[in-house]
Amino acid sequence: MSKTILITGATDGIGLETAKKLLQQGHTILAHGRNEEKLNKLTKELATTGKIETYLADLSSKDAVLYLAKEVAKNHSSINVLINNAAVLKTDVVTTDGLDVRFVVNTLAPYLLTKKLLPLLKDSGRVINVASAAQASVNFHALSGKAITLTDMEAYSQSKLALIMWSTTMSKI
């Protein structure tokens, strides 16, 4: 049975390879990316393989995450799978809202997108959060809000740990 699957970060790496494989299996892919040029290339490359739609959004912006959810809901009454794959490691450190970009994209955006799309996932929907073996134990000094600077890898590791923690909690609900 063909499924409708939203993949964030579908223009590169794991997201791209996942989109390719799922298209080959006959599923409809809703491919998200933050770069319009890469999304256009993706469409040209994969359009003959199967049904693919693209969605442009910068997941470091809360408004863009909400817009992505709204656009998906406008075009689909239901989806079967949400794959939260998009992530950043090395980037500008702070969003326009004053938040760490890595934490916003890697943790907060998947949470917010999942929350907004839950009504479309219905009873048998699935959420897959792509984490990392790079997650690390909590840096309580950083967590307390004291002014410290984390390396890119430390911040990435903390954001992936948070993703794993909320995924575990959500799986029990």
Feature map (PLM): residue ranges:
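Catalytic loop of short-chain dehydrogenase/reductase
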Residues: A87-V94, D123-I173
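A glycine-rich helix->loop->beta "capping" turn
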Residues: T49-E53, E71-N84, K90-T95
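The beta1-alpha1 cofactor-binding region of Rossmann-like NAD(H)/NADP(H)-dependent oxidoreductases
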Residues: E36-E37, Y55-K70, T96
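Conserved glycine-rich cofactor-binding loop
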Residues: G9-G13
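A short, exposed helix-loop element centered on a Lys and neighboring polar residues
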Residues: T114-K115, T168
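Ankyrin-repeat alpha-helix packing hotspot
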Residues: T107-L108
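Conserved glycine-rich Rossmann-like NAD(P)H-binding loop of the short-chain dehydrogenase/reductase
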Residues: Q25-N40
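Aromatic pocket-lining residues of Rossmann-like dinucleotide-binding sites
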Residues: L22
